[in-house]
Amino acid sequence: HPSLKPGALNQYLSERWRKHLAEYGKFNCGIYADRGTYPRFSPATSRRDAWPPGGGLPGSDVAFLREQLLDAYNISYGVLEPLIGVNTSRNLDEAAALCSAANDWQAHDFVDQEPRLRASILVPQDDPEASIKEIEKRAGDWRFAQIQLGSKTSEPLGRRRYWPIFAAAQANDMSIGLHIGGTQNSAPSASGWPQFYIEDHHMLVHSMQNQAASLILEGVFEAFPNLKICLIEGGFAWVPSLGWRLDAHWAKMRDEVPQVKRPPSEYMRTNLWFATQPVDEPENPDDLRHVFEWIGWDRMVYSSDYPHWDFDDPHLAFRFQMTEQEKRMLFRDNALAVYTFRD
């Protein structure tokens, strides 16, 4: 996750938007203006050793990122996932300007400095027309590997208001990375607001389950059969049970959703991929292997979550034995199947 240095986007914004942000600030989708998050995160939600020795936030120093992550783990490609809130403004024109500036920032300040990195196309997802414009502007640029959306949305992503974004993704052969987070229009759970960080961290998975069900049951993958979506940082142990539950419901009530031509779990095996972070840690490590097998080894993509505090070390996160073929799929082949890597 790359971090913004103070004022880093200014050089990529027009004078109109620099003045606007200086005078009015960013109008995010929150309950209160400029409220602090609660439950509290750890500082920058990051590892203690990820703070660059030269100063700045974790993830803001390309040289230190190169040393601590890319070189340390022999990483060929690393996909940037900016969590900087530029696509969640209530002011859609502001969101479009900020997304475009953030895309320039990723390309120039990170990928141009370290060609093993690849950027994500940030889009103002509640403005499909502006999103399409940004996708078409960046899709041919080798520095961009995917389109990034957030899992907390104004409406479920399967709704047809979002379909133009999916059409543009498929037409440009770009995958979508659906990362946890997004708008904060309401409480993070159907039960209200949590009191503890441990609750809040667990609740992140719920938005992923909801979005997976929406995408499948609204018929997105029938309309866009070549669309590839990777669910990122929502965990994955829940995936088999969701598939089983949806299949059972579909068998009884399929006439309600005639747009769903196949059992829902089949779409999960053809159009969805799952990033591994955060890795679950059962007492018996082989239980996790069973989860991989239920989902399918070809669906799993390693993710580090660097520089966050729950970083998953590729050497330590998976405590069961893998064959060489399984390692290649998890750490290499599946990512090459999902993402657009061009040199």
Where in the sequence are the language-model features?
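Helix-coil boundary/capping segments in enzymes
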Residues: 1-343
